[in-house]
Amino acid sequence: MAEGAAGREDPAPPDAAGGEDDPRVGPDAAGDCVTAASGGRMRDRRSGVALPGAAGTPADSEAGLLEAARATPRRSSIIKDPSNQKCGGRKKTVSFSSMPSEKKISSANDCISFMQAGCELKKVRPNSRIYNRFFTLDTDLQALRWEPSKKDLEKAKLDISAIKEIRLGKNTETFRNNGLADQICEDCAFSILHGENYESLDLVANSADVANIWVSGLRYLVSRSKQPLDFMEGNQNTPRFMWLKTVFEAADVDGNGIMLEDTSVELIKQLNPTLKEAKIRLKFKEIQKSKEKLTTRVTEEEFCEAFCELCTRPEVYFLLVQISKNKEYLDANDLMLFLEAEQGVTHITEDICLDIIRRYELSEEGRQKGFLAIDGFTQYLLSSECDIFDPEQKKVAQDMTQPLSHYYINASHNTYLIEDQFRGPADINGYIRALKMGCRSVELDVSDGSDNEPILCNRNNMTTHVSFRSVIEVINKFAFVASEYPLILCLGNHCSLPQQKVMAQQMKKVFGNKLYTEAPLPSESYLPSPEKLKRMIIVKGKKLPSDPDVLEGEVTDEDEEAEMSRRMSVDYNGEQKQIRLCRELSDLVSICKSVQYRDFELSMKSQNYWEMCSFSETEASRIANEYPEDFVNYNKKFLSRIYPSAMRIDSSNLNPQDFWNCGCQIVAMNFQTPGPMMDLHTGWFLQNGGCGYVLRPSIMRDEVSYFSANTKGILPGVSPLALHIKIISGQNFPKPKGACAKGDVIDPYVCIEIHGIPADCSEQRTKTVQQNSDNPIFDETFEFQVNLPELAMIRFVVLDDDYIGDEFIGQYTIPFECLQPGYRHVPLRSFVGDIMEHVTLFVHIAITNRSGGGKAQKRSLSVRMGKKVREYTMLRNIGLKTIDDIFKIAVHPLREAIDMRENMQNAIVSIKELCGLPPIASLKQCLLTLSSRLITSDNTPSVSLVMKDSFPYLEPLGAIPDVQKKMLTAYDLMIQESRFLIEMADTVQEKIVQCQKAGMEFHEELHNLGAKEGLKGRKLNKATESFAWNITVLKGQGDLLKNAKNEAIENMKQIQLACLSCGLSKAPSSSAEAKSKRSLEAIEEKESSEENGKL
């Protein structure tokens, strides 16, 4: 190895070759990841990975300027109805010549060829200087070289044999401490560690694709450095090509090695149904034209070449090479490590992995020998097993025994309409659709019909109607098809007394014992649970006083349409209309009695738990803005129903998130109107098995807790999380419905929207990929801080970039709690909410803990965080000495709890950084990397796993280099901090819990105590708010500490298992393995016994 790779390098003079040797210091140095390469070589087109082309190809500078102009974010939330989109803006162009200027990367051979041709990379120095250099791989594959350089040619090189490790991303000290690091694209950066001291050569490519080529190629060369490099002979003997030959020969009935083009096209479509026939035919023509032949017959070689170019997704190939230790296939062990370390799958075994291989590998040889090649791996990643949605949430997974008021309830507005509320006819299919979608609250707006038969109709036009009886028969049939949990019928009664009696009789007859009519118990304080009300139908409506002698009476008419009347009428005097109600209909109303809202103070004093209020969107918005805390507290006990403003004459939808943030349970939506708001609603209720009930966050359920719907900061007692999303690629994007451009040309980009409390709302977008709908590569990473994960949703939106109105392609909305980590495919939905076949986004998801406040736009490293003053959640002064003295006792335990959690997290991040891994990496990945550093040249470990008091320590087996000492020191610190937390957590948590209990003893008398001390009005309210804040902090920090302890215990288990699998254990005998297994359980058993002793 030449020392030139890491030695001092002065900036080259301005007159050096091409003038490119001047260091570029500043934003221009790394802000643009796509720049023209020197030497007449073609640059990346962003529609695929470019291999070298002919010299003299002009640089696409105009396209670069257009890309920069389009970089301004747009509001993707404003999605227009595609049927109303009009032509306008620039025209999209279609090229009818398809000879490619680039070739996809589909093998290691392609990577090596690219590296030998060379390309420009930016070389980053520790002094923050950046140099443009042209890097190439020697023809003998033994060294990297770069130019221009002031060094001798033999020094401006790096021997492949000296390379220890290749890291993708900004994961070295040079990148982390460089002043320009924030301006360097994470996905374009990579580092080559070399020499005994692991010095780093830090580089930035012009695109993520180019970075992936270099990383994959170098890893392949390093892994093969001790083996003959015979792969350069070509790809003809790889398992993939052998399988394709078998497929071709089976279809070649004549056995002459030639097949009709039509037959070849059909065969490739059978192997990959997502491909378009026209694209396959075009590929054959390209291949034949390159060979200067024109024929309608295809050879075996041409068939294999076409299939590999059409069906190889470069981003999947790079991933496979990365996790397979640079083979071009995965064995069972590779797959097991991928599932455990990257996908977060637990309890995985070799047999499970072999079963996956047998189900997804396409070749018979692969299935028999137990390996998964690129095509089978692609199929596996596209399968439901790698869906982004957590399969546990596809069934009922939440506690269903809480009071009804503790759940969000899937609700429909104007269920009987299938169009807008002015022109739309009444239709029975509206109920069928809503109930099949898991709706648990439907609306029946009933009026008098002819022949004493109540009807449902659109009272704005009275054109068509359906009979009340037919509607409730349909409801009875479909009520519990999608969910067994209770169905609420919101009765809009506009009938005369005789027809009210008919309604009551028909409901009794059709629903029978499904009708819930039990009188509420005054001794109870909360509504029954969904579990207790399973398969029951609850009628919401007006109710007469309980006097049985009163057979009929007047009640207030809270017709939703009265809002419009009040707005439109100049004669409205504020008095509510009275209607007559019969006893028979009144008796069907039990635990959902409609009452009028006055104010929160009156409601909290006099409202019964079985009474509920309906709020118009306008009124609810006003209340949410003026009294956010009161609204949340009110909804802990009482049900609230929110319905869209009557001014929405087009039946557009309100934003349900605004009212879910206030704890409102029944936010009624116009199911007949698709769009972003309905996407949020549909996505939210996919969780918990789609049963129509979603448990609200505990901070919105606890009797004493502090939460404001308008909060824009960190919540007391809730630890914010960092959500890392990498948008890798898209697959098979359709042309937008109603788009005006000819052909299938689209310029897609992706928006990521975070919906939740105001503190969490955020939006980011990718770059635009020009003219690529089949497999656009985005390769962009985003990070978001999520303060209340239980109430957050992520919406992926794909749009077609246009100067006038970006057109909708597809979207997918998912609750934060349903995200699966790792590499996942996102199935996109159409504008009306239907899943589009084969249309997906390929993403990587990671969720990590985050300390401190502020929006998470840039990664905070532990080294930097350690220099900051640690922020502690502070308790508030109430103004009542007795209570304040109790809460003061908790100050020290709270600081201890926060210190233990943060110290452990910082120690974990530090060891990850030393391993060259980002904070999102798992400890399993960390130990795999660490073990590779601790294995000597003769393949023996330099350290050994030693269990001390059931904790996994690593001890040197002799003298070790300073680099390894540094890593072991960081590892020991992680174990020490984890051990300290595990051993001290229960004691500290007990102190916090005791302070919380002591404080809660004053809860009932808080107002009286405040009055005695002279607190009243705003001061008393402030004292009550501060008391709730303190209780919330204590409960939350206690729970966080308990969770941190469980996490630490699980980490110790994973570390020990990883050490065993990586060969860092002295004795692999069965007795040693049994002893290790017992050690895994020792900590947990010890902790369990201590907990049981306290009970």
Curated annotation (Swiss-Prot):
Residues 398-542 form the PI-PLC X-box domain. Its main location: cytoplasm. GO terms for biological process: gamma-aminobutyric acid signaling pathway; intracellular signal transduction; negative regulation of cold-induced thermogenesis; phosphatidylinositol metabolic process; phosphatidylinositol-mediated signaling; regulation of synaptic transmission, GABAergic; release of sequestered calcium ion into cytosol. Residues 1-11, 1074-1095 have a biased composition (Basic and acidic residues). Residues 83-222 are annotated as: Interaction with PPP1C. Residues 113-223 form the PH domain. Residues 585-701 form the PI-PLC Y-box domain. The modification Phosphothreonine is found at residues 93, 556. Residues 1-61, 1066-1095 are annotated as: Disordered. Phosphorylated by the catalytic subunit of PKA. Phosphorylation of Thr-93 resulted in dissociation of PPP1C from PRIP1. It comes from the Eukaryota. The modification Phosphoserine is found at residues 47, 77, 95, 569, 1079. One of its GO terms (cellular component) is cytoplasm. Expressed in a variety of fetal and adult organs including brain, lung and kidney. Its expression was greatly reduced in small and non-small cell lung carcinoma. Isoform 1 is predominantly expressed in brain. Interacts with PPP2CA. Interacts with Ins(1,4,5)P3, Ins(1,4,5,6)P4, GABARAP, GABA receptor beta subunits, GABA receptor gamma-2 subunits and PPP1C. May form a ternary complex with GABA receptor beta subunit and GABARAP. The formation of a ternary complex with GABA receptor beta subunit and GABARAP could be the key step for facilitating the association of GABARAP with the GABA receptor gamma-2 subunit and to allow it to be transported at the right destination. This is Inactive phospholipase C-like protein 1. It comes from Homo sapiens. The gene is PLCL1.
